[in-house]
Amino acid sequence: MNAKPGLVAIYRWRIADEHVEAFRARWTHATRALKPHGGMGSLFARADDGTYYAVALWPDRETRERAFDATGNSEPWPPAERLEPILLDPIENLWPE
């Protein structure tokens, strides 16, 4: 990754076991579709309490908004309870480049 992210978005869901694989496939598709619009990648993970998280990196808030507007949400997502996303403005970034 050449540029450092100016925004980190943390998305959270509760997903029933029978929908996890379909949800993961849809998340992968969405992440790849956002890349040409400025998305810097994402990580999908499961916490100990069963909540699923995606941590997505963006150059800035405006790029994220434009990317979501450009890609739309025409494909349905598998059933999941979506929790409020958390948006972070990085102060110090020591992740590998």
Regions found by a protein language model. Name each.
Residues Y53-A56, N93-E97:
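Short, solvent-exposed polar/charged micro-motifs at secondary-structure junctions
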Residues M1-A3, E97:
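Basic/polar N-terminal segments that are highly enriched at the extreme N-terminus
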Residues R14-A25:
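Short, surface-exposed ligand-recognition loops at beta-strand->loop->(often short) alpha-helix junctions
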Residues L7-R14, G41-T71:
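Short, well-ordered beta-strand segments in beta-rich or mixed alpha/beta enzyme
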Residues E21-F23, R64-R66, W95:
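Short acidic, gly/pro-rich beta-turn/loop elements at beta-sheet edges
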Residues N2, T28-M40, L57-E92:
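An amphipathic, aromatic/His-enriched active-site/gating alpha helix that lines ligand/cofactor pockets
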